């Protein structure tokens, strides 16, 4: 069985192959989300605590949280369900998934280090992979640098260097949800347009109602005149 061990603190992960079944037997009958003492896996993991995050069986079917079985099942899945990505709107599909209980039929088991042990694990705890991209949303940049609302977020956005041929230039993401005077002005303009359009519609509706009432009055007067004319011709 392969153990895919990740360490979110450093942003690293590594796959370790374990040939001895006795070493991975400690994970059997455990569920996704449960924690396991690393000392049972090997002396190099002494003091470590692993959390089971998921895995795949030997045919490549993923483990699904909430399916309390050590076997494979077929479930009807819709949008928002893990292990399924709909291709069309409203599409549902019955798909095979592996239960959340660990067994010997697994090929890969994903583990997360929740507590670091005494020794360093080569390629996982002794290395650090910095995040390639910084925060993009204005509030997240403020939170990241501990800024107040008065500080200008644009000065703190994380830029990255891009080398293209002989030229080296920096690139920064477009800050999302950034409140600027231009944005406030645009909002005021849109609100004023909305009010102006509503007023114009009300005036047009009132004008139409007035015209309609005038036409109805004229029609009534014409009909009354016609009735009067007929009555006078009958008398004659």
From Swiss-Prot:
GO molecular function annotation: structural constituent of ribosome
Modification comment: Phosphorylated.
The organism's place on the tree of life at top rank: Eukaryota
Pfam family, one: Ribosomal_S6e
GO annotations of cellular component type: ribonucleoprotein complex; ribosome
Keywords of the record: Phosphoprotein, Ribonucleoprotein, Ribosomal protein
UniProt-listed GO biological process terms: translation
Sites of Phosphoserine modification: 232-233
TM ranges: none
InterPro entries: Ribosomal_eS6, Ribosomal_eS6-like, Ribosomal_eS6_CS
Family: Belongs to the eukaryotic ribosomal protein eS6 family.
PANTHER family linked: 40S RIBOSOMAL PROTEIN S6 (PTHR11502)
Name used for this protein in its record: Small ribosomal subunit protein eS6
Native source species: Eremothecium gossypii (strain ATCC 10895 / CBS 109.51 / FGSC 9923 / NRRL Y-1056) (Yeast)
Species classification: Eukaryota, Fungi, Dikarya, Ascomycota, Saccharomycotina
Designated gene of the protein: RPS6
């Amino acid at each position: 069985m392969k153990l895919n061990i990740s360490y979110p603190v450093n942003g690293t992960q590594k796959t370790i192959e374990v040939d001895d079944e006795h070493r991975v037997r400690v994970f059997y009958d455990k569920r996704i989300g449960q924690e396991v003492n690393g000392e049972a896996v090997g002396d190099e993991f002494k003091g470590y605590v692993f959390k089971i995050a998921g895995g795949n069986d030997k045919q490549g079917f993923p483990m699904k949280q909430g399916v309390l079985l050590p076997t494979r099942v077929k479930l009807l899945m819709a949008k928002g369900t893990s292990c399924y990505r709909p291709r069309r709107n409203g599409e549902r599909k019955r798909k095979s998934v592996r239960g959340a209980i660990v067994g010997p039929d697994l090929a890969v088991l994903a583990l997360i280090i929740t507590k670091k042990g005494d020794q360093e694990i080569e390629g996982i705890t002794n290395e650090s992979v910095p995040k390639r991209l910084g925060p993009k949303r204005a509030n997240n940049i403020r939170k990241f640098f501990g800024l107040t609302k008065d500080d200008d977020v644009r000065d703190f956005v994380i830029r990255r260097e891009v080398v293209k041929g002989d030229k080296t230039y920096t690139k920064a993401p477009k800050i999302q949800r950034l409140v600027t005077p231009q944005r406030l002005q645009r909002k005021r303009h849109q609100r004023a347009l909305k009010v102006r359009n509503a007023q114009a519609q009300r005036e047009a509706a009132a004008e139409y109602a007035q015209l309609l009432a005038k036409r109805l009055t004229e029609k009534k007067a014409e009909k009354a005149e016609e009735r009067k004319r007929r009555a006078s011709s009958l008398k004659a």
